[in-house]
């Protein structure tokens, strides 16, 4: 090789070497590049998004009461073996799938596992092992948004921006941690929603329902303001396992307190109210156990004759014939108008997006039929109402004739400070009954419990008032008609504090009467009373 070629080769090599040196110098002095390189070694993990909670009227949590834990799984640290026993089947599947992962990941575990040398962080669990008011509150979809009930109605408020805390993990090429993870809190802007429910009263009613009913609901209203203190529907469901209940024949997702049902004799106080307002309190009827209307026979329960009964006796014995004849004396317009004033046939708004079923208040034209009107007078036929409508009616009697729309919402809350933000509902009231009529009805309904069909609602040491109802549904099982069993009333009878409605729907023969269930709830309320 000639000398010129050797010099050229050496020159080329020298040039390449100089270029490499210059490039290295530039890389070392370029801070932006260094930052970008560092960023490439940081893994960002997202903790579950924070969601606003529901609170009772005293500010106690109804959701988010329990804690779940998110454990950090790091490659090469034996996460599979250490955490397998502390997570559920889905978590175990995740561990298996990511057993050879090249970067850290988060895994939900059932406890704080920091004692195992594993970093973990708490996050609120939406539902507890014994969730409250599940049909009312609703549930979340797979993306964490409200899919039913109040969760859906307030989804935008509760979700906020949807942001959650982030975990910054600096790792090496093998995915192992180079430094302690850094938790970066996020402010999603989500707010809480305060309801009128009482957590203690709700828990009491839930416990009674669990012990006594298969299908139905329990409502408790604060008589003074018609605020809903408890709203229980049975059967229940697991908000974290919706698929198990979607096709269940007993409809566990249904909020029964807001649906409409045949009401039966629990409607008779409405007819009694119309009579008292019209000055017909002295009406007397001799009951042979049945009543003929244009050739059609309407029987009292079991066809049992009640003999001569006045308004008090007819309510105590729940005499169908008496109320048919009383209704005929009053006229359909008067009875229907009273029912309308007491809220029948009208949906009760709970939120902008949630309201009860309106039910069915038969039109005047329908009640022109003597048979249809006879049925109407003792709560049968086309008449349908929701348990909350029945509660509003009974509450009107209990609070002296003032009809107040039942309320479910209080305010939105700043969850950090507990400060109320926006009032969500206001008391709406109007006088429907005179004080004299309401007082007379209170005494009459106290008689139903003291010596009538509602005797199982009686409490030792405390008075109660109310009305039973057994409504035909037209549905049969094994040749036996299924019925709706009601009790609606208030405690104490003299100075009512709570209005309680119990419904057991589409049952052949329930294990407990609705009056007995009412008594259990009332006894629980007495224990809770300060």
Language model feature labels by segment:
Residues 1-243, 283, 336-341, 457-458, ...:
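Periplasmic/cell-envelope proteins involved in peptidoglycan metabolism and beta-lactam response
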Residues 63, 222-265, 270-504, 530:
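Beta-lactam-recognizing serine transpeptidase/beta-lactamase-like catalytic domain environment
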């Amino acid at each position: 090789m000639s000398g010129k070629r050797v010099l050229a080769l050496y020159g080329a090599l020298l040039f390449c070497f100089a270029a490499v040196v210059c490039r290295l110098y530039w890389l070392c002095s370029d801070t932006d590049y260094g930052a970008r390189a560092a960023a490439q070694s940081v893994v960002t993990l997202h903790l579950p998004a924070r969601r606003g909670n529901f609170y009772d009227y005293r500010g106690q949590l109804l959701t988010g009461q329990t804690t779940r834990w998110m454990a950090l799984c790091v490659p090469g640290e034996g996460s599979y073996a250490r955490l397998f026993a502390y997570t559920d089947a889905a978590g175990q599947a995740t561990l298996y799938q990511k057993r050879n992962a090249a970067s850290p990941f988060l895994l939900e575990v059932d406890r704080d596992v920091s004692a195992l040398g594993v970093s973990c962080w708490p996050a609120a669990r939406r539902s507890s092992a014994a969730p409250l008011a599940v049909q009312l509150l609703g549930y979340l979809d797979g993306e964490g948004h409200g899919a039913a009930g109040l969760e859906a109605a307030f989804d935008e408020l509760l979700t906020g921006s949807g942001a959650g805390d982030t975990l910054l993990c600096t790792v090496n090429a093998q995915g192992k941690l180079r430094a302690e993870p850094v938790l970066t809190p996020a402010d999603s802007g989500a707010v809480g929603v305060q309801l009128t429910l009482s957590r203690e009263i709700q828990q009491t009613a839930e416990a009674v329902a669990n012990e006594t009913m298969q299908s139905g609901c329990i409502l408790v209203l604060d008589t003074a303001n018609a605020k809903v203190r408890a709203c229980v529907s049975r059967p229940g469901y697991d908000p974290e396992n919706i698929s198990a209940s979607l096709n269940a024949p007993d409809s566990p997702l249904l909020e029964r307190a807001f649906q409409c049902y045949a009401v039966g004799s629990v409607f008779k106080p409405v007819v009694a109210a119309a009579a008292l307002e019209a000055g017909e309190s002295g009406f007397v009827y001799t009951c042979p156990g049945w009543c003929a209307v244009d050739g059609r026979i309407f029987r009292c329960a079991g066809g049992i004759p009640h003999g001569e009964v006045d308004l008090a006796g007819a309510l105590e014995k729940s005499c169908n014939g008496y109320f048919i004849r009383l209704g005929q004396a009053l006229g359909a317009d008067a009875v229907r108008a009273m029912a309308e004033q007491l809220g029948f046939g009208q949906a009760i708004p709970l939120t902008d997006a949630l309201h009860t079923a309106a039910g069915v208040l038969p039109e005047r034209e329908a009640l022109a039929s003597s048979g249809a009107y006879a049925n109407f007078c003792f709560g049968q036929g086309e008449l349908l109402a929701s348990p909350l409508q029945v509660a509003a009616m009974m509450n009107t009697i209990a609070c002296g004739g003032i009809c107040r729309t039942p309320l479910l919402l209080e305010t939105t809350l700043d969850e950090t400070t507990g400060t109320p933000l926006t009032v969500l509902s206001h008391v709406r009231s109007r006088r429907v009954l005179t004080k004299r009529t309401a007082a007379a009805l209170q005494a009459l309904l106290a008689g139903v419990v003291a010596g009538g069909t509602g005797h199982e609602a009686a409490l030792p040491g405390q008075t109660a008032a109310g009305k039973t109802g057994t409504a035909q549904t037209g549905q049969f099982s094994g040749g036996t008609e299924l019925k709706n069993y009601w009790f609606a009333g208030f405690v104490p009878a003299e100075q009512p504090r709570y209005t309680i409605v119990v419904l057991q729907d589409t049952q052949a023969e329930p294990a407990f009467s609705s009056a007995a269930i009412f008594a259990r709830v009332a006894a629980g309320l007495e224990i809770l009373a300060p």
